[in-house]
Amino acid sequence: MDKVRLGMIGIGNMGTNHAKSLIEGLVPEMELTAIADRKEARREYCREHFPAGIRIFEEGQDLIASDVCDAVLIAVPHYQHPELTMIAFDHGKHVICEKPAGVYTKQVREMNEAAARTDQVFAMMFNQRTNSVYRKMHELVTGGELGAIKRVNWIVTDWYRTQSYYDSGSWRATWDGEGGGVLLNQCPHNLDMIQWICGLPSKVQAFCHIGKWHDIEVEDDVTAYLEYPNGATGVFITTTADAPGTNRFEITLELGKLVCENGKLMLHKLSENERTFCKTAKGGFDTPECTVTEVETDGENEQHVGVLKAFASNILHGTPLIADGIEGIRGLTLSNAMHLSSWLGHPVEIPFDEDLYLEELNKRRADSRKKEDSDVVFDTAGSY
């Protein structure tokens, strides 16, 4: 085969944008051959706006069972991600899954076990891994040239959302429909970056404020404290209610500090290891010499299209993925730990008790409000 035939399951905000990219030919080695959506209004939209040859299904399982595609992209409500992924594997389909990998790690662990039993390609839509600035941060930190991490700070409050956004779907911003708020919907990208660049912390203490700024039952404002195995600490702050918001990611290491803000990466490079300087300097107020430079990157930032290109190329040629599907559990581990810590009111060790997390989640699902359905779809371009 010279092109991967893709079936899109879910034509909501993200699915629609992915479908448009494929129809416009932005992914040369992939073609959209089928879509599935339970909403008649979305299926009718596809009949009116998509090429006539694209097959239209109501159920994702029926699309998977058909012979019209080699791979599927899963862009449905979060709880269904692992379920549909495992069904696709059973039918010999390659899978690329939208974030998050699922709602709770116990569910995603089962999905990863299924992935390990198949030869099919499994990828996650972690589009921020294509960002040249984050890739350079990953290179500098994991390469070790700046020494060990001492501190991680990320204020990411530029995820502004209106009440209209939260009212746009019956499943959105509910425990039973979405499984969480800003941590599950917007921040999987950021949490993936933290674990990809800095690794997973060993302990989390979080404060997740429920419906602080919007009429929703899930969190829209979070402050979390992180502790790492080597003694490093971190703070993660996010909300969907700050305007204007901030997006500043700082990593302090033994030989300097990286600051990512406004699309630029600045390196504050020390003349020597701070730990050595602290122990050997004679003056009580001496500080290490420091030079500040903007770090050059390759400038590439293909986002979702780049992830799809890599997925197709991996299937056809065996080239590397942007993000292996089994890595989705790592960022979810962070968000689950934050939720659990906030629910229990004390720090949570990682790994945490997955059965306890599910028990606490199900308590909230049992009381989850029912919302009226809506067919509103937003253009998500530039919002991620």
Regions found by a protein language model. Give the residues of each.
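N-terminal Rossmann-like dinucleotide-binding module
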Residues: M1-P51
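Predominantly a Rossmann-like dinucleotide-binding segment in NAD(P)-dependent oxidoreductases
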Residues: G10, Q128-D215, G345
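Residues forming the Rossmann-fold NAD(P)(H) cofactor-binding site
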Residues: T16, P82, P188
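Conserved SAM-binding strand-loop segment of SAM-dependent methyltransferases
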Residues: G53-G60
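Beta-strand-loop-alpha-helix segment that lines the small-molecule cofactor/substrate pocket
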Residues: A71, P77-R129, G144
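Glycine-rich phosphate/pyrophosphate-binding beta-alpha loops
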Residues: P188, W213, I237-G245
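Active-site beta-strand termini and strand-to-loop segments that position acidic
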Residues: E219, A224-N230, I251-L253
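C-terminal glycine/acidic-rich active-site capping loop/insertion
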Residues: Y228, E254-I326, V348, E359-Y384
